[in-house]
């Protein structure tokens, strides 16, 4: 048997051909008679019928070949899969053939084409910086979208809107809205600078179609009385809809009993509360005279209560910080990141020793945050793990 050092200098192409020809790996076989395309089983590691010794065998073999895993070590099939996927997508000798793969069957598989020497894949592969190579390794299925639509991505969300007043006619906005707009514009530079500091992770975690819709939960006296989802970039929380010419969506509080104290408080809601949910995070602006305290990931230190100022835009949740904390959590370096913001409506301004229960509470969150934290696939978690190690060792995924 050749030494490990010799094996590591062999080409990925030769290794792949050898494994397909060997017949040792279930599901790994030629896809055409000319032996120019091959299949790789691609079952999700979280499936109940996942069999590591079969469904992950080829990926584990690649990890052993590259000396990234030793027999007896505790490894993760999703990490092994991501390593081989990265190697295939970085190589100029292979290209995926999506139309021949089947991901909607009991035994899903992908198909890759082995390109003749001297040819190029159908997708032009421009010379990439190390940063962009890392992006394509982490999320190759999104590479085309990111390369063709990068100006509409996370780094420059011109379509997401930074105005809490939304995308309607500016002439319909109040002066207070304009003030909030300018404050958001001032904060945009800081947010985008933070994004640029970690572009790889953000472009991976926040694809172009991320769901920034707003999830609202209304609570009266400690009891949930209603939930709704707002898909527009901004909205106004009101007691009753008005015939305003503004194009901003109006979201009504659930109707309590007319004699309840909650109704008396809602009668004072007046112009309501503006809420914006976009790629930068969650923002609110109090226009009503009701005292409102808030608790959110961006709350200042101290026990509070933290009161919303009148007619001033306040940032409750920042997507960049959430993604940073999410990566640390998946790497075992921190707790699950917080993503919920809470507004408490009071009959009178609460002090530091205020013990009276507030009558109205509104919980809000962005849909994408809960999705990433609770439902992100194991393969994506593995990609985050690999990303950090790739940045520490740029050649870790080479071949």
UniProtKB/Swiss-Prot annotation:
Which SUPFAM superfamilies did the record assign? SMAD/FHA domain, Winged helix' DNA-binding domain
Q: Does the entry feature the keyword Phosphoprotein, yes or no?
A: yes
Key words of the record: Activator, DNA-binding, Nucleus, Phosphoprotein, Transcription, Transcription regulation
SMART domains, alphabetized = IRF, IRF-3
What is the first-listed, main subcellular location in coarse terms? nucleus
Q: Name one GO cellular component term.
A: nucleus
Instruction: Give me the positions annotated for DNA binding.
Output: 9-116
> One Pfam annotation, family name?
IRF
Q: Which residues carry this modification: Phosphoserine?
A: 139, 393
Q: Which Gene3D superfamilies match?
A: 2.60.200.10, Winged helix-like DNA-binding domain superfamily/Winged helix DNA-binding domain
Question: What's any GO biological process attached to this entry?
Answer: positive regulation of DNA-templated transcription
Give positions of region: Disordered.
Answer: 118-189
List, as start-end ranges, the regions of compositional bias called Low complexity: 171-189
GO-annotated molecular function: DNA-binding transcription factor activity; transcription cis-regulatory region binding
Q: Where in the cell is it found?
A: Nucleus
Q: What function is annotated for this protein?
A: Transcription factor that plays an essential role in anti-viral immunity. It mediates signaling by type I IFNs (IFN-alpha and IFN-beta). Following type I IFN binding to cell surface receptors, Jak kinases (TYK2 and JAK1) are activated, leading to tyrosine phosphorylation of STAT1 and STAT2. IRF9/ISGF3G associates with the phosphorylated STAT1:STAT2 dimer to form a complex termed ISGF3 transcription factor, that enters the nucleus. ISGF3 binds to the IFN stimulated response element (ISRE) to activate the transcription of interferon stimulated genes, which drive the cell in an antiviral state.
What binding partners and quaternary form does the record give? Interacts with STAT2 in the cytoplasm. Forms the interferon-stimulated gene factor 3 complex (ISGF3) with the heterodimer STAT1:STAT2; upon stimulation.
The protein depicted here goes by the name Interferon regulatory factor 9
């Amino acid at each position: 048997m050749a030494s490990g050092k010799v094996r590591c200098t062999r080409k990925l192409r030769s290794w792949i051909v050898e494994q397909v020809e060997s017949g040792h790996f279930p599901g790994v076989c030629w896809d055409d008679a000319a032996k120019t395309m091959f299949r790789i089983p691609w079952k999700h590691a979280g499936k109940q019928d996942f069999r590591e010794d079969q469904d992950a065998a080829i990926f584990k073999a690649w990890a052993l070949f590259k000396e990234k895993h030793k027999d007896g070590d505790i490894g993760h099939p999703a990490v092994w899969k991501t390593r081989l996927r990265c190697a295939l997508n970085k190589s100029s000798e292979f290209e995926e053939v999506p139309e021949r793969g089947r991901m909607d069957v009991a035994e899903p598989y992908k198909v890759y084409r082995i390109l003749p020497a001297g040819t190029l894949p159908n997708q032009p592969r421009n010379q990439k910086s190390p940063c962009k190579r890392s992006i394509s390794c982490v999320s190759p299925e999104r590479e085309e979208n990111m390369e063709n639509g990068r100006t509409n991505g996370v780094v420059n969300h011109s379509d997401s809107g930074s105005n809490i007043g939304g995308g309607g006619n500016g002439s319909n906005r109040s002066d207070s809205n304009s003030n909030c707009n300018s404050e958001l514009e001032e904060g945009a530079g800081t947010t985008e600078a933070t994004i640029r500091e970690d572009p790889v992770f953000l472009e991976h975690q926040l694809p172009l179609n991320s769901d920034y819709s707003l999830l609202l939960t209304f609570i009266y006296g400690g009891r949930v009385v209603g939930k709704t989802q707002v898909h527009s970039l901004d909205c106004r929380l009101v007691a009753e809809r008005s015939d305003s010419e503004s194009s901003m969506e109006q979201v009504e509080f659930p109707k309590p009993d007319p004699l309840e104290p909650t109704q008396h408080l809602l009668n004072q809601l007046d112009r309501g509360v503006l809420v914006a949910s976009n790629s930068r995070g969650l923002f609110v602006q109090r226009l009503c005279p009701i005292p409102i305290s808030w608790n959110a990931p961006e709350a200042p230190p101290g026990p509070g209560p933290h009161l919303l100022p009148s007619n001033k835009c306040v940032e409750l949740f920042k997507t960049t910080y959430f993604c940073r904390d999410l990566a640390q959590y998946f790497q075992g370096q921190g707790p699950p990141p917080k993503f919920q913001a809470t507004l408490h409506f009071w009959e009178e301004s609460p002090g530091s020793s205020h013990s009276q229960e507030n009558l109205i509470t509104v919980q809000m969150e962005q849909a994408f945050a809960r999705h990433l934290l609770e439902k992100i696939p194991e393969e994506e978690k593995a990609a985050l793990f690999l990303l950090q190690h790739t940045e520490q060792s740029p050649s870790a995924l080479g071949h």
